[in-house]
Structure formats: structure tokens, C-alpha cells
Amino acid sequence: HYVEGSKTFSFEVAEQLDWQVPDQLIVPVGSGAMLNAICKGFEELQTVSLLDDVSNMHMIAAQPHGCAPIVDAFKKNNKEVIPVEHPDTVAKSLAIGDPGDGRYVLKRLAQYNGFAEECNNKEILDAILLLAQTEGIFTEPAGGVSISVLQKMVEQGKIDKNDRIVCYVT
């Protein structure tokens, strides 16, 4: 039921974007189930002709340093995720050392021209503060992970700040 329920993230985003496909989606990743569900939701919206081609959107998996097995696998071009034995991060909800859907996330990143990136505890906490100060949104650390990765990717030129960007804040 988790996957089916999490698909609604994509339904809500599509409606808020007036049925336009986002360019970039940044998802905080623990087990990987939410990222897979979001992809499935966008695909279903395309199937019923509510969205145009979703294959051009880019999925980005965001993980905290100290528990980033999917990021490690992606950067090493591995097809399998090697578990982290002792996760150590302020983002406790993402501290899943052996992500059950990790292999599927890697497939989704390839399918959607995406990538995976990590951020450290200080970057996470700074992003939480930034979000609170600029948007009045108070998030748990997983939300800080996605915001921090967004900042990092814009600074590195991997994401154009003028793109239609969706950053999932949980």
C-alpha cells in the first residue's frame, strides 16, 4: 500500500504544475520506495494522457552522507547497492543502510537521465534553516537533504536554476 499511496505525490505535483512535466525532481531516499512510487505515478498520468512524455524529466536521488549506499553505487556505476553497516546521519528517517529498493532506484535513475548525490550533516541543517527562513517551512532532516542537494547541484551547474524543479520535502 505504501507505493500506491506514495504515487499521489506525483499526482499532486502534476496538478500544481498545471499538468506540465517537471524538468528535475529531487527525492530524499532511504529505502528507495518513494522515488519508485513517484516515477510510477508520473508514468500512470502519461498513460491516461494527463501528462505528455515524462521520459525527459530527470530524477535525482538525494541521500545523507553517512548513509548513502545508492549514491555510492551510482557514482561507481554499480548495478547492485552495497549496504552501509552503521548508518550515521542526522537524517534518521533516511538511515536505511540496506535499501530494499536500491537496485530499482538505480534503474529509475538510468531511465530518467538522473543521478544521485549526497550531502553532509552541516549542509542538511543549513538547508533546514534556509527553508524555514525563506519559505516558512519547517521540515525534518530528510527534507533538508533534498534542499541541500538542490543547492549543491545548482552551484555545480548540474541543474539550471531556471528549470521547473520539484524538491520533495518530507
Where are these regions (language model features)?
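Substrate-binding/catalytic subdomain of NAD(P)-dependent oxidoreductase enzymes
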Residues: 30, 57, 128, 137-150, ...
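Residue-level preference for the first positions of well-ordered beta-strands
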Residues: 24, 136, 164-166
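Short beta-strand segments
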Residues: 27-30, 60-63, 167-170
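Active-site/ligand-binding loops adjacent to catalytic centers
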Residues: 1, 44-139
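Phosphate-binding loop/pocket of nucleotide- and phosphate-handling active sites
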Residues: 82-85, 145-170
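Active-site/ligand-binding-proximal alpha/beta "capping" segment
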Residues: 1-50, 126-131
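Short helix-terminating capping/connector loops at secondary-structure junctions
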Residues: 19-21, 50-56, 158-162
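Short glycine/serine/threonine-rich phosphate/pyrophosphate-binding segments
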Residues: 3, 29-38, 67-70, 143-150
